[in-house]
Amino acid sequence: MVVVATSASGARKVATIKTASGPIETGVGFLSLPPADNVTQFKRVRAAGANYLVIRPVAWSSIAPSGATEPTGFQPTDPADPNYKWSGLDTQVKAAVAAGLKPILIVTKAPQWAEGSGRSGGPGTYKPSPSKLAKFLTAAARRYSGTFMDLPRVRYWGIWSEPNLNTFMSPQTVGGKSFSPGWYRSMLNAAADALHGVNSSNVVIGGETAPFGVKSADRFGTMPIAFMEKVLCISEKGVRNKKTKKISSYVYKPACKAKTKVDVWSHHPYTQGGPTFRAKLHGNASLGDLGDMRNVLNAAIKAKNVVSSKKIRFWVTEFSWDSKPPDPKGVPIAMETRWVSEMLYRTWSSGVSLVTWFILRDQPTNLQWQSGLYYLGSTGVSSDKPKPILRAFRFPFVAIPQVVSKKKTIVQLWGRTPTSSAGSVVIERKSGSKWKKVKTLSANGSGIFKASITKPANTVLFRARLADGSDQSVAFSLKAPKHPWKGCPFGTC
């Protein structure tokens, strides 16, 4: 049993997690462009300090043969079967590895012959067959085993995109009862057996959940924490304070005997506000709710409901804010630059060890996503311009004030070096028009540096720079924005 307390007033607070001591690696997502542009883009991802490239969607339905039935003679576990169409993915994987990146392949969308009968949802979403998915993943893992033709090794495999949404997996409920979590668990287990069967060091990433759902799940989707609890067979119960009658703690217990085979649980914690924003409804999960998700995962691990030969990790495999400009409803770029550094700090504090930014470059303004690290150029990739947030993503640094008494304020310093490697980092404060040294910190082997200092008088801005002078962070103000942005992901409201 795991008990998690809330605030004394009964309101939920950010769940307390032991101060993280591990790494916080980064990645960037990729939306397909002509192959000629891949090399430039992937080099930019690496230059952004990222080690991972998320390739999504890897549409099973686009690689496998189409139609209502499997073709005669089709060998679904054979990566060389002529019915498969791998060439586009081959090109992306080869270019990513050549750029020094680790590809994460997010597999989704079933071919028609691998769906359940009587489809009521969108194409590729309806009761995807766990056994047929396993055969496809066997072929894919063999193809990218590092020993097939001239193709490189792929180790990281995400199973489905946002399976708690009707858009990607249906039905969410059957007869008014939750259905998708149990079906998804079967898919995860089949996928894990297939991928680990090819190579035991393959990493199976589960979850990939969207941040928002509704209680009547079939109208839209299942709340991500509720979905997670059902997949991992954990029940949650609120315990009410006897005086206030409000929930003062949560108790997590095993809810069934089913086991889930997964190496990483991942989430997409988009927000309607800044880095500490919590979803309005309990069960949904934005950035400020990651501690709650971590508590569910910890409870499942403690109950031995999760089966893995590896240390089970918690990742954010998709996140971003649209920026203004170019999106008139996006986050003002100066505010977003601050928030990117703080987002990486807050996710690290919640036990997240990998964060991937949704896309590298903006889409045109007549499309949905202007959340890239680069502004879209007028004449193609070569004319793209980096946004100020790129430096914050590459070299995150925060200085968070904490008032101890009327006369004393502590400043919590945290950052990560651009290459996620050890070294000396100089912390500076702005005094008048000049920057003055505060102290020198040692970054650990993962590039993390941190310290607590007493706030110097008349100081608002801090920054970090590498001791060799080769790079420096964006300056971070002790004064948070007075009127922080509130809106919808991708400027949709």
Q: What are these regions, as identified by a protein language model?
A:
Residues 433-440:
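Surface-exposed loop/edge segments in extracytoplasmic proteins
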Residues 441-455, 464:
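Glycine-centered loop-to-beta-strand initiation motif
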